[in-house]
A protein has these predicted regions:
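Conserved catalytic core of the tyrosine transesterase superfamily
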Residues: 1-303
């Protein structure tokens, strides 16, 4: 029996928590374990770092779209689980007590500036020119997040069959299993073709034929691994601050808006059910206009 099962049995049998409370604890803890890409039997608290928990919180907010109150409940469940492990000798490392709850105020989305993103894309193009499967795949991951505005969960769940035969569209299954079709620009279509060619010529796809993004062993990559790929590639290209799939999604939306795209078109591409969720990107554009004004406007320069 796993340590997760032991804890759930403890709160249900010894602490006599209500069935609803036990169900919430089970949901929150198993969601974290699944996000790590492991099973409850494989869970080992001594291999978990504070950064894992912080990245999971970011995933809950940005990819799952949970409110701060829901994220705080999930962290509270994980914190109780961790305290129990400490008290019962299942771990000696307390990495969660200093994790702060989420503020309820909404932050502006973080995005990569145009000039820096050009550097990222140039580095990715170099990677894709290679015949090394993992190098090409990692470049494809970055390109798809940036040029399609996908959520982490959407790319993770994507299959080969979601790419149209002419490589001009991708079928995306978003929140609530809502399906949208996102266009693929020509250059990106050619990059995907190169990736498919390597995947099939090197027999990478034998174990898992349908998953779009695979490991070198032919297995669907976990969400955590996709995050690591993006974080590493952006940092290697000089991106400072946050570097995650959702930062690339924000960058996709912000750059489109700055180039004059209609807000409702961006809403459709992102898969937002409400225009209100998309309007947050207008604040990024306003901030950029202020910066341009302060640098370029003659009246401002004379101050």
């Amino acid at each position: 029996m796993s340590v997760v099962d032991d804890f759930l049995r403890h709160i249900e049998g010894e602490r006599r928590f209500s069935p609803l409370t036990v169900r919430n604890y089970r949901h929150d803890i198993l969601a974290f374990v699944e996000w790590l890409g492991i099973t409850p039997d494989e869970f080992d608290a001594d291999t978990i770092e504070r950064g894992h928990i912080e990245d999971w919180m970011q995933h809950l907010i940005e990819d799952s779209g949970l409110k701060a109150s829901s994220v705080n409940r999930s962290i509270a469940s994980l914190r109780s689980f961790w305290r129990w492990m400490l008290a019962h000798g299942r771990t000696k490392r307390d990495i969660i007590s200093t994790i702060k709850p989420q503020r309820t105020s909404r932050r502006l989305p973080t995005f990569v500036p145009d000039t820096r993103m050009e550097s990222v894309v140039a580095d990715v193009v170099d990677d894709i020119a290679s015949d090394e499967f993992e190098r090409v795949r990692d470049g494809v991951v970055v390109v798809l997040f940036y040029t399609l505005g996908l959520r982490l969960s959407e790319l993770h769940g994507a299959n080969d069959e979601d790419i149209s035969a002419d490589f001009k569209h991708i079928r995306v299954t978003g929140k609530g299993n809502k399906v949208r079709v996102v266009p693929i620009i020509g250059a990106v279509g050619e990059i995907i073709k190169k990736y498919f060619s390597l995947k099939y010529s090197q027999n990478i796809c034998i174990a898992q034929k349908k998953a779009l993004i695979l490991s070198s062993k032919g297995e669907r990559l976990s969400q955590r691994t996709l995050q690591r790929i993006v974080d590493r590639r952006l940092k290697e290209s000089g991106v400072q601050g946050k570097s995650s799939p959702h930062v690339l999604r924000h960058t996709f939306a912000t750059h489109l808006l700055n180039m004059g795209a209609d807000l409702r078109e961006i809403q459709e591409l992102l898969g937002h059910s409400s225009l209100k969720a998309t309007q947050v990107y207008t604040h990024n554009s306003i901030e950029q206009l202020k910066e341009v004004y302060s640098v370029a406007h003659p009246h401002e320069r004379d101050r």
